[in-house]
Amino acid sequence: MTTNNPVCASDAHMEMYSSKLYTSALFLNLIIATTSMILTGFAIQKLFMESIINISTRMFLFCGLMCCSLHQTAYIVLRIQVIYQVFFKLSEPCNLYYPAIDCKYVTFSLVAGNTGMIFIQSAMTIDRIFATIFPKLWPKLKYWPGVVLSILMIACNYANVQIIFWGDPLTEYVPTCGQFPSKSVNRFQTFLAIALYMSIAHMVINVIILYINVLQDRQQSKSFNVNQRYQSREALKSSQAIFFLSMSQFFACLIYSVFTKVFLEFQLNLSPLQSGLVLALSYTTPYACIAIPSLIIFTFRFIKNQRLRNINELRSQTETGDECMRKIAKIWEK
């Protein structure tokens, strides 16, 4: 339940709503969010149309894109709300703020989108660990690792969001739905610190896995078993793709975590206009949600080209091996 007495916007907040620079930043946010949704659509099409990496990895990437879409959808709704305030409600300063309870789904979706991308990163890392430890067994499981780990991480993400907002009655009024409820801020900051350590762990583990896969590929490249060499190359390419995407997500999480912690720490020292402009121009997740689908599209194209080159190399190596065996047979017959 919210209080029956709405809060009127202060002169400082009215300055923010009236700022043409702030309004321009809002439209820029809309353009960025809309662009990311379009790129996400192309990336999802790539995931479904091209099977150049294993199905589990594609499932994780799909879940990551869904987290981006969840965040960006809420972000678009948020920005449209503020633009509506700017154009149609400036004459009603006591009717500008939103009850926090009415912003529940927008706020929860923004947080769930951010935290979901971190948990999906964990799922991809766990999958690569088992694929490296059990190189023969893991491919035979097909899509099951992706299904199980995706469900597990989605459940963890849902539980995490509930814990962050646990016991918060959401009774206050907020200038925009993007403003974090004051009673949940401490738990959210705690998760940001944990998420940063999680991302560092993901990076270290993926570097180790990539190194192991390179060694495995070098060993298998000497084998005459084409299937083993092909599986080894596939594992290496999947690890390279996940390492590349994990690296980008790591930096996105690092920047997001540091930015959010610093912003929450110094927010009270900023005027509403300064605070609004900082959030509108420096909030990193919308940019990350443009980068991730773009990187997926680029990575798929790169792997596809590499795969074609590798297949041609394997064919030429197989012919060379057969010729060698024929020569040995001729020598033996003599």
Curated annotation (Swiss-Prot):
Subcellular location: Membrane
Membrane topology: Multi-pass membrane protein
Transmembrane segments: 24-44, 58-80, 106-126, 146-166, 192-212, 240-260, 278-298
Residues annotated as signal peptide: none
Pfam families referenced in this protein's UniProt entry, alphabetically: 7TM_GPCR_Sra
Keyword Transmembrane helix attributed: yes
Protein's name in the database: Serpentine receptor class alpha-11
Source species of the chain: Caenorhabditis elegans
